[in-house]
Amino acid sequence: TVAVEKSMESMINLDGATLMFPTSFGYFDPHMLKEAVKFPAVQFSHCGGLWQEGENPKNTGSYFGYIDECQYLNGIAAGSTTKSGKLGFVAAKPIPQVLRNINAFTLGAKSVNPKITTQVIFTGDWAMPVKEAEATNSMIAQGIDVVTCHVDSPKVVIETAERAGIFTCGYHCNQSKLAPKGYLTGAEWNWEK
């Protein structure tokens, strides 16, 4: 939105910021890219953006944490727990960082049982609670007994799975309190270190 651009401009013009971290997925294009053109002396780094060398301004870039390594471990836990051999993954969009997480989760599970399958349902956006619940319920109806996700509102997936009595692996932060019976483990961010 225009408010995002105004906030960045305020940080640059009033506070003297020379390095910007606009972290929300939707901030990358067009907002960060527009501001980078306006302020070529400021470096813009976007968490998870779809930055491409040679196509985006030289003062822009992107970064992302290696949470797919944690998703691999989630997959091992899921693969060791499933009775059906069917796992589920509720995801927002088919972009590289999400696909890395899906692949890592599946490879982790297959390291325990090569016959395991992972069904993926994309909701289309980062926070779609109704679609996330529908996707989880659809997977449960198909006999999937462990689910995980890559969405901004994992609480919905975790709570839906817990109510249905299946297992979950969390994402973003510790959600074990949401699913005391079915929470196996989770891929959690720790930006402090």
For each feature predicted by the language model, list its residue ranges.
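A residue-level marker of the well-folded mature domains of exported/periplasmic proteins
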Residues: 1-193
